[in-house]
Amino acid sequence: MILSCQSISKSFGTDEILKDVSFHIEANEKAAIVGINGAGKSTLLKIIMGEETSDAGEVILAKDKTIGYLAQYQDVSGHRTIYDEVLYARTDILEMEQKLRDMESEMNSRTGEELEKLMDIYHRQSHEFELQGGYAYRSEVTGILKGLGFSDEDLSKQMSELSGGQKTRVSLGKLLVTKPDVLLLDEPTNHLDMESIRWLENFLRAYKGTVVIVAHDRYFLDRVVTKVVEIFQHKAYVYQGNYSDFAKKKAKVREDLLKQYYNQQREIRHQEEVITKLKSFNREKSIKRAESREKMLDKIERIEKPVEDNTDIKIVL
């Protein structure tokens, strides 16, 4: 288990959003959080990230694991180019690269034992740089930006020139190059064309980490996720499989619950009719029997009638 939500509750004033929400996500798992608009999906992601506080419960992230978050609306500013904005998301790699360049220059002025010591340090740091993906990093940045729909000409554009949608794509690119252990993505396909969506699907499926997605695109979720967490009437319900698997299981659960509801309603009406009849006899014994049945009815845990499935998912063609 890499991420666990335990008994999360959240209200805004008198408006209850989440109630006793519990689920866990395994390492390398790809999961979706679904529900109607206003169900609390984005709020839940913010609670996981620590951008919102819950009224109760806790979020547990496995020790030494990193987490990254793409919100629906991003406002990336500054005077860098698109390419540099994403490139500088990994300053650790750039700093390692600069140290290697500095050592290469310093080697020209070193001889003998000093040179050997410097070369030993260089080889060790060069190996670490390779393990961190440093030698492929610049081409990786270019590949991710192109995958997200930016052309070669776009890469030299200033961030200040970009639209809100383009800035969100840049933010997504920055997140992808940092490779956190857990990716939280809130509507990652909103500003992508079909080609870029397909690229992102492939990227996330191959991603060596955990991915948690809020999205409205059913086909996208079908191709990426293997678990669905539904936020329904303030609580969380977990289904294994992709979105289509979830939809089938949810329909069956609703059908079974509807049968239970109608069966219970029939029994309640029957008991109410018996109570009315017993009271009509107007005898002490009959009234006591009626009162006994009323107490029994009061103790019954009423099944709520399941509402229509209005999960806010659309088909993107």
What are these regions (language model features)?
Residues 118-127, 270-280:
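A short, surface-exposed helix-loop junction/capping segment
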Residues 250-274, 286, 290-307:
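Intracellular alpha-helical coupling/juxtamembrane segments of multi-pass membrane proteins
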Residues 1-262, 315-317:
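ABC ATP-binding cassette signature C-motif
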Residues 79, 138, 294, 308-310:
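Alpha-helix initiation and N-capping motif
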Residues 91, 209, 273, 280, ...:
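Generic structural signal for secondary-structure transition and capping sites
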Residues 104-108, 247, 276-279, 298-301:
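A structural signal for long alpha-helical coiled-coils and helix-turn connectors
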Residues 151, 280-286, 312:
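Short, flexible, glycine-rich and Lys/Arg-enriched loop motifs at helix boundaries
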Residues 307-317:
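Flexible loop/N-cap segments at domain edges
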